[in-house]
Regions:
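Short glycine-rich anion-binding loops that position phosphate/pyrophosphate groups of nucleotides
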Residues: 21, 112-115, 178, 268-270
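Beta1-alpha1 glycine-rich phosphate/pyrophosphate-binding loop at the start
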Residues: 2-79, 172-215
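FAD-site-proximal beta/loop scaffold in flavoenzymes
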Residues: 125-155, 248, 256-328
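C-terminal, flexible cofactor-proximal segment of oxidoreductases
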Residues: 329, 334-428
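FAD-binding core/adjacent interface of flavoenzyme oxidoreductases
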Residues: 1-12, 78-168, 263
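Rossmann-like dinucleotide-binding core of oxidoreductases
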Residues: 159-216, 223, 234, 320-337, ...
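A Rossmann-like FAD-binding core segment of flavoenzymes
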Residues: 76-87, 182-291, 297
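Short hydrophobic core segments
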Residues: 16, 102-112, 241, 257-267, ...
Length: 428
């Protein structure tokens, strides 16, 4: 039995990836019809939209994660395996790992996306990504550790590098992170670090295009720009990064910025798997799928979420890489596969539920079709939408209490610089 998964008379569906798409599909597919195997490198689901709040000490990591095994403990004939995929043979329907191989009948590719450094090794070496909970914790530790080091330093230049923060990418992640950092500078630094001059801390937000939040309307972009400018964020539009060194960044306008924390939020690319290279033929290294989420070049292979490139009449350049797309595709495909007659099928139709981004306390932008909201109402909408999509009652409650507490007292209670302790016996 490969991976201790018993043979079954039912068709075996293997899901690669436990993100929004893979997690939702595994919940919706009928285990009375199929044997289900969910493979992910982690044993938990992580709620990506709130990574930046973990990095800013606003919420604890466990409140945006949910154990996969706990979620499926009452569902029969589903097997969770924590593995790294080495290669997939879609012709013979075999998955290879370092542990062994596994045969499938139906393959669901939901590997998501990873940070795109555009082939620049320096960008990858000297910046901090924000695509996982572990990376969010690493960024949190970097921020706190550098502030502690800044308190000890009498060198103005060193303090500048330790206190300044540079964010590359003016999409939702970059905007939300810049706003959270600005509020930390205003409300937290003077109280926790009275020995430091908080006014010397600079937050730079760099965007290659002509506006922030360029996937939203111009109203949203302008509002985000105005609010962040009022909050003291230095915004660089129409500006590209030409080079990055250990603690210095060079911009296309000739400006040099110094910081030990350069955060990369400037784009993603599909997570590729060996053996599927021929399918990664779409922009952003995605896998082209038809209107039924099928990978046309192979039988019984489907792709969902960020890894899938699906063109529609409304989205000729492909559906956006958003959680609602992944969730809707997963529900659609599970419903299709649960039916016995797959020939009578309807094409996937994406329902655009709008987009939103928070800028700071009581500040957000929200758009749905022709409706545009900003300020407190949009912020409340952002809060409740994110609480709604969190997995687990405990997580919803903890995040709500943390947000309420932070709102009332202007403080964040999770500023802990926890460094991993490596046992001496492993230091070989």
């Amino acid at each position: 039995m490969p991976f201790n998964i018993p043979n079954s008379n039912k068709p075996r569906i293997v899901i690669i990836g436990g993100g929004f798409a893979g997690f939702k599909f595994a919940n919706r597919i009928d285990s009375k019809i199929y044997q289900i195997v969910l493979i992910d490198k982690n044993n938990y689901f992580q709620f990506q939209p709130l990574f930046y709040q973990v990095a800013m000490s606003g919420i604890e990591p466990s409140s945006i994660c949910f154990p996969l095994r706990k979620n499926f403990r009452n569902k029969k004939d589903i097997f969770i395996r924590t593995l790294d995929i080495a290669e997939i043979d879609p012709i013979h329907k075999v998955i290879y790992t370092d542990t062994g191989s596994l045969v499938y009948d139906v393959l669901i590719i939901a590997t998501g996306s990873q940070t795109n450094y555009y082939g620049n090794l320096n960008f990858e070496k000297y910046t901090i990504p924000l695509k996982s909970v572990s990376e969010a914790l690493y960024l949190r530790n970097c921020i706190l550790n550098d502030l502690e080091q800044a308190v000890l330093s009498n060198d103005a230049s060193a303090q500048e590098r330790l206190m300044n923060i540079i964010i590359i990418g003016g999409g939702p992640t970059g905007v939300e992170l810049a706003g959270a950092l600005s509020e930390m500078k205003k409300h937290i630094l003077p109280k926790d670090y009275p020995d430091l001059d908080a006014s010397k801390m600079q937050i730079h937000l760099i965007q290659a295009s002509s506006r922030l939040l360029d996937t939203m309307t111009e109203k949203a972009s302008l509002k985000a720009y105005e609010e962040l400018t009022k909050m003291g964020v230095c915004i660089h539009l129409n500006t590209k990064v030409t080079d990055i060194k250990e603690d210095q960044l060079e911009l296309s306008n000739g400006l040099f910025l110094k910081s030990q924390k350069i955060i990369w939020a400037a784009g993603v690319v599909g997570t590729a798997i060996k053996g599927l290279e021929v399918a990664h033929n779409a922009p952003g290294r995605k896998i082209s799928v038809n209107q039924y989420c099928e990978v046309p070049i192979w039988k019984d292979v489907y792709a969902l979420g960020d890894i899938a490139y699906m063109e529609t009449a409304k989205y000729p350049s492909g559906l956006p890489g958003l959680a609602p797309v992944a969730l809707q595709q997963a529900s659609y495909l599970a419903k299709r596969l649960n039916k016995s007659n797959l020939k009578n099928r309807l094409a996937f139709n994406y329902w655009d539920k709008g987009s939103m981004a928070t800028i700071g306390r009581s500040k957000a932008v929200l758009q749905y079709k022709s409706l545009f909201l900003s300020g407190f109402i949009a912020w409340i909408g952002w809060l409740f939408v994110h609480i709604y999509y969190l997995i687990g009652v405990r997580n919803k409650l903890i995040v709500f209490i943390n947000w309420l507490w932070n709102y009332i007292i202007y403080d964040q209670a999770l500023r802990l610089n926890i460094k991993p302790k490596i046992p001496q016996s492993t230091k070989q």
